Amino acid sequence: MADDFNLSCPIPLFEHATVQMAHGGGGRLMRELIEGMFLPAFQSAEPGAAGKQSPPHDSAVVELDGARLAFTTDTFVVSPLFFPGGDIGRLAVFGTTNDLAMAGAKPLWLSAAFILEEGLPMETLRRVVASMRQAAEEVGVRIVTGDTKVVDRGKGDGIFINTAGVGSIPPGVQISPARVVPGDAVILSGDLGRHGIAVMSVREGLQFEGAPESDCASLSGLVEALVDAGSDLHCLRDLTRGGLAAALNEIAGHAGVGIELDEAPIPVAEPVAGACELLGLDPLYVANEGRLVAIVPAEAAERTLQIMRSQPVAAEAAIIGAVTDVRPGTVELRSQLGGRRIVDLLSGEQLPRIC
């Protein structure tokens, strides 16, 4: 595997010779980095595994002594550390446990690793740690191990946090992009763009009328309700970096299907829509921290929608589109005026360091 990864080629593998902010933005450059460097280096080399890799998902699924576990990790570098509706501590817990939930898993354990900058006020650290504890109690997950490093003053930005999580997947639950097929319905759990706009508003000192709070929230209870109700969930994806657009492009690409969206039922709060219009942003690409998209069989869509709407975090859930066999790997939006446009991956970085 190492020899294959280091093959000499006269054509550069990457467009940029150095890491760019957009390599962490959830768009095209991030996908190229993952698929061009990390996956070839780290994918399983077990005998017989070649050509049989599962599509990438928010969590790895590991079988151990008959049990199926979900395992994931995430790193949080949000700036500022505190923002309307949340903080880096809540993000560090909810972000990782939400990734576990996207595999249908009940979160069990977390690790927490801190990179602290010299000079950080202890009161700031105390607030972040207290927030993490409260968030963990809300989810019902235990923080069981961790690590701490301190870097020189000016070599960090206050606090960076990494969390890794393990969760248990109930028997019979199979959630993966590989299960997505033409005819499936696409359901969005709530309005878009709150988190990205909330963070950017504070960071840039922007003031909007009715400025939104982040949607930072746990999705574990919502997924547990769907699983307990026996919902046939083909795929789940939380809408973090790159927003709804990035999530659906990933699913369409990995499943080899097309996805057609209707603009009209996609909920966007008025303050978010106004801020996006003013700043030239598309809400489809703005990050969320408490929203998911569910892809289910068409015949199960209405029942799934009602279950979702019974949960406070998904009260505004809506069916927003369908999976097709037209233009595999492509996401297309039908506008309220009847026009159509391709919803592609971003090539640059819209809102850096929002999680």
Task: Go through each PLM region and give its residues.
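Helix-biased detector of long, well-ordered alpha-helical tracts
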Residues: M1-C355
